[in-house]
Amino acid sequence: MAEPAPFTSMFTAMGTPDLVLDADSVPTPGEPGATGTSNYRINSTDDIICYDITLPGVTPPFQSPARTATHIHEGAVGQAGPPRLAFPNPEGSGDPLTSEGCTQGPITTGTGSTLDRIEADPAAFFTDSHAATFTAGALCGQLTAMPEGGVETGAGGTSDSGWAPAAFRGTRGVLVGVWTAAVVS
């Protein structure tokens, strides 16, 4: 489906193997060296979520009893929880594996699951990907709200100071990094 405009909210999650929990909320090792960035853009008015998921260091095959092995779960920091949204598993011919696109509800995973619940309390949700050798999760990361257009890092300056900020955007225009670069005249 085509990406809508505008979005009502944006979220990011930085996944690491040390944040993985089993179903009883016990810390469980994820895949060593795995990292991940998941960026989500929500239009809760039209019940649409768009996603850009990048997983360097995750070894397929993916495996989960759910429809796919890449999810947003409901669970605060340190708490396991049920999957609420399933996304296509990342793919690729090498490293990193990626998945991107948009999907429209209604959400059918869990009772009462709506995108506006994520908007109301993003810290109550995390994202993860499950692999055959790491069934509890290869990695996991808590959702964090991002203002549309990115975040002010405080880095940078003016051309008079010799330094200026430079923003880098990934696929679909999502801010993926801000660097400060010297201005050379």
Set out the residue ranges of the language-model regions.
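Metal-centered catalytic cores of metalloenzymes
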Residues: M1-T70, E74-V184
